[in-house]
Amino acid sequence: MSKSIFIISFYNNRSPQNLEDLIKQLMIYGQEILVVINIDNYNNLELERHKNLSFLKRVNEGMNIGAWNQGWRYFSDFDNYFFFQDECFLKNNNFFERYEELLSIEQNGIIGESINPKWNKSWDEMSLLPLNYQIKIDNKPINRVDFYQKKMIDWKINPGNSSKHLRALNWALTNKTLKLINGFPIGKNKEECIAAEISVSRKIEEKKLKIIQSDLGHFKYIGHTEWGEHGMSKLKEI
């Protein structure tokens, strides 16, 4: 039987209520649970263990994806890795069985609840859409598409022809796949973190693996407090 770990990212300035609720839901599966706590201006890497529940305190670098990457590298001997933002909640108790089934298919590289429909297009199409607005990096204007592709190239990831990607709300990957892609890139700011989110799916496809949404509809097994069930827009802007 494969050995799995649930890794939850949490920002210490937020209320712990969602985190506590998610931990309670995940405990029924009897797997190891790790909460990676992002803390501003923190200089240590500190682990606290309580049976199957551990807390890893770290500097807030790379936001959720940075926390997930740290968790995988710290707990590197599991077969399957399930990553969650603390705002996630389980909608279907069969989620673990479904995800393990999908992870057992060798061609499947990454599993999640929501492939971003607004970005499920070619880069050429994206460059013509209003979503490709200008941002400022180092006080210099640049279009989002150009910047995200540039960051991927900096990270030695081929952007490919498509911007298709799984939202970094929850992901599941095997240890074999994580080693193949060498974990996740770490963004230094919000825009770099968006680039990191897209680049993980791009690297999965670069390795000839598939990006898998767990069901035809969004958020069938795992919901998120910020997102509507159709996956098109947030319920509220933070």
Indicate where each model-derived feature is located.
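Short loop->beta transition adjacent to catalytic acidic/histidine clusters or analogous donor-positioning motifs
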Residues: 2-4, 26-35, 53-54
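Short beta-strand-to-loop acidic/aromatic patch adjacent to the donor-nucleotide binding site
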Residues: 78-89
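Conserved catalytic core of nucleotide-sugar-dependent glycosyltransferases
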Residues: 90-188
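Short, well-formed alpha-helical segments that are part of the catalytic scaffolds
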Residues: 13-27
